[in-house]
Amino acid sequence: MERFTQKKTSQERKYVLGEQEITQNPYGYTGAAVDRLGVFEDVFEDLIAAQERLAAQLEELRLQGKTKSYQFRELMGKKLVNSNVLSLLRTYGIQ
C-alpha cells in the first residue's frame, strides 16, 4: 500500500499529509487520502456490525444446544478473527 502520510517523529503518533493527496472544495475536503480514510471507516463499521450479528447467531445456536456443530465453530472462528483485528486497531488508538 502506498502511504499518504509521513510520521512527524518516531516517538509520536502524529502524521502529516502532502497537499497533493487532498483538495478543498465548498463541501469540505476530497482526494485519494480522504477516499482511503472513508473506506477504512466503512471497514471498521462493518467489523463492528459483523461482531454484533455473529454474537446473535452464536447465542441462537447456544439456545438450540448446537455448540458442537460445524456452524457454531465456524461462526466462533470468524468472531475471534474479527476480535483480533479490532484489538489490533485499539492498540493503535482506533476505537
Which sequence ranges carry the predicted segments?
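Extended, charge-rich alpha-helical interface modules
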Residues: 2-95
